[in-house]
Structure formats: C-alpha cells, structure tokens
C-alpha cells in the first residue's frame, strides 16, 4: 500500500484488524509505504482488506495498492515487524498534525502525567515532517531517537489497546524533549514568575 500511510497509526490499525479477522502474518513500513502479508482461512484475507479500506485512519491517504497471491509461510501470529529500507519509491511525508482532542484533554488535566507538557502526541497527532530524518518512518529515523522511552511510555507503546501503540514520537516530561525560555544573558525564565505554561512565558517575553 503506497503513499500517505506512515505516521498515521496505520500499522497499529492493520494489526488490530488482522487479529480480529484471525489472520497471521506481518505488517511493516517500507521506503514507499506499507507492506502487509496475511494468511488465514478462505475468504478471511478478502474480508480483512475490505474492512481495512473502509476504516482507514483519519489522516491516511491510499493512492496505490499492489496485491500478490503467494504460498503460505506458516506464520503463527500477526506482528508488526522491523521496517524494510530497501529502495523502492518515494513515500509521502505527512505534515505535523495539531494535537487531537484526547491529547489536549491530557494536557489540561492536572491529574495527567502529561499536564501542560507541550510535546504531547499519539498516533493521531503530533510531529511528523519536522522530526523525520529518513524513511521508513520509525523512531530511529527521527530526531526522537535521542530520547529513550521511560517505562510508562514504553508500556503505552507496547499496549495494543492504547492509542499510543507504536506511536513513534511518544514521550513525556520524564523522558521526552523539554522546553525552556532564556533571556539574552542566558538566564532562564522559570515558572516562579507566576506563569503556569510555557506559552504564557513566551507571551510575557514577547509583550
């Protein structure tokens, strides 16, 4: 499947659908899009593909599909596997996506561990184009490779029911990028000045 299918939660969506249809095989990113290999009972792959095309993630755009019938390889489960970086076309890179309602809710919730965290994101939103260094789109090919996930972020990343399942830019105040405002002399403007958010700090400096 080619074009805008990386960085939109496509692989997690494929994984859930494949498991729901009782299929075995894998899904992985490639240089030109996403490769899916499915094996199952007669009719199951066709039903899976129809469901996939009917329920694409919000920001996914499919412009080309190539289907091949092959002999079963005997996979025992369905997995998201390591990307294939073999040259094979030019994929479409997504622009950065505005925070989704769920992420905004977390950022505004004092009980959330991402309260006021400006880099909150998930598979439905957050940075894409601005952090990509190479394709396929994997954390190791983005500027986020410098930030090792904390145990809690890693748990979300591995949880198939979590909206951050395989979200490549995932992070939090404990393990992700941070932001600070510096004066021209190098001194830092801290929250002690009566500001609750980085945005309020910046607005005060620019006023």
PLM features: residue spans?
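Gly/serine-rich nucleotide phosphate-binding loop at the start of the catalytic core
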Residues: 185
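Intrinsically disordered, low-complexity, mixed-charge
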Residues: 1-180, 189-196, 203-204
């Amino acid at each position: 499947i080619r074009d805008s299918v990386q960085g939109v939660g496509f692989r997690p969506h494929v994984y859930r659908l494949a498991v729901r249809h009782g299929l075995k095989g894998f899904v992985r990113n490639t240089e030109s899009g996403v490769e899916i290999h499915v094996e199952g009972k007669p009719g199951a792959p066709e039903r899976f593909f129809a469901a996939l095309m009917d329920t694409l993630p919000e920001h996914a755009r499919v412009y080309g599909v190539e289907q091949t019938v092959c002999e079963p390889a005997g996979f025992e489960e369905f997995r998201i596997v390591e990307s294939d970086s073999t040259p094979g076309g030019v994929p479409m890179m997504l622009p950065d996506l505005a925070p989704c309602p769920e992420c905004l809710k977390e950022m505004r919730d004092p009980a959330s561990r991402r309260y006021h965290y400006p880099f909150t994101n998930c598979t439905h939103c957050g940075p894409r184009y601005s952090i990509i260094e190479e394709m396929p789109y994997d954390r190791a090919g983005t500027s986020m490779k410098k930030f090792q996930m904390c145990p809690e972020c890693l748990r979300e990343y591995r949880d198939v029911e979590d909206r951050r399942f395989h979200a490549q830019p995932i992070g939090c105040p404990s393990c992700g990028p941070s932001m600070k405002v510096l004066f021209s002399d190098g001194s830092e403007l801290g929250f002690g000045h009566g500001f609750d958010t980085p945005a309020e700090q910046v607005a005060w400096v620019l006023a």
